[in-house]
Design a protein with these regions (language model features):
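Feature of secretome-associated and extracellular-like proteins
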Residues: 1-3, 18, 159, 166
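Residue-identity detector for glycine
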Residues: 12-14, 98
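Compositionally biased, low-complexity repeat tracts
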Residues: 8-10, 29, 152
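N-terminal secretory signal peptides that target proteins for export/translocation
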Residues: 1-11
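OB-fold and OB-like single-stranded nucleic-acid-recognition modules
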Residues: 32-185
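Bacterial N-terminal signal peptides
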Residues: 15-27
C-alpha cells in the first residue's frame, strides 16, 4: 500500500507561508499600479467645514466646467494660504481631475510645470484657492495646453509638501506620470 502525503503536509507550515508570501509579493505590484481616484474635497482634512455641492445632471459638455467647479465648493471655505493638508495622502498614487495653470512652458510649447486647481480661473483671479486645493505639478513630458477651459486628469504620486509660486501657495506636489483630457463618463 503506497500512501503519499498531500503536498501541503510534505512542505510544512513554514514553507507554505513562504510560498504564500512570495505569491502575494508578485501580485502586489498589480494592485499598486492602479491610482486612487480622488476628488478635491478629499484634499481637505476631516473636521474642516464642507458644503455639499448641488449637482444637476449634465446635458452637454459646455456644462463640464460648472460640474468641476461644484465639486470644488469646499475650497472657498478653507483658510488660505496655509490651509491644513491630509497627511495620510503623502506617497499615495492618485488620479485627480482639474484645470492647468501654466508656470513653465518648454520651447516646444509643452507645459512642464503647472498648478492643478479645482475650477477654471483659479489663481488667475484673486484670491487664489487655499493651499490644500492646489497641487504643484512637474512633468518631464509636459502637456500641450491648447485651451485653458479644458480640464485634465493627472496621475502620479502625491507628496504632502508646501511650495510657493508667484501665483499661489500649494500644499501638495506631484510629478505627473500621466496627463490626459478629462471626459464625462
Amino acid at each position: 500500500m503506497n500512501r503519499r502525503m498531500p503536498p501541503a503536509k510534505r512542505l510544512g507550515p513554514g514553507a507554505l507561508t513562504l510560498i504564500l508570501l512570495l505569491m502575494l509579493a508578485l501580485i502586489a505590484p498589480v494592485w499598486a499600479g492602479e491610482p486612487r481616484e480622488l476628488d478635491w474635497p478629499a484634499l481637505i482634512p476631516e473636521g474642516a467645514p464642507i458644503i455639499e455641492p448641488q449637482m444637476a445632471p449634465l446635458h452637454d459638455l459646455s456644462q463640464l466646467s460648472d460640474a468641476l467647479s461644484a465639486e470644488s465648493a469646499p475650497a472657498a471655505l478653507q483658510p488660505a494660504p496655509n490651509a491644513p493638508v491630509v497627511q495620510a495622502l503623502d506617497g499615495q498614487m492618485i488620479k485627480l481631475p482639474g484645470y492647468i495653470v501654466p508656470l513653465e512652458v518648454s520651447e516646444e510649447g509643452r507645459t512642464t510645470e503647472f498648478l492643478l486647481v479645482p475650477y477654471y480661473g483659479a489663481c488667475i483671479h484673486v484670491p487664489p484657492p487655499p493651499a490644500n486645493q492646489i497641487v504643484h505639478i512637474v512633468s518631464e513630458m509636459g502637456v500641450r495646453v491648447e485651451d485653458l477651459y479644458q480640464p485634465y486628469w493627472i496621475e502620479g504620486t502625491l507628496k504632502v509638501a508646501h511650495s510657493s509660486s508667484e501665483l499661489a501657495e500649494s500644499g501638495y506636489q506631484m510629478e505627473a506620470e500621466k496627463i490626459y483630457a478629462y471626459e464625462l463618463k
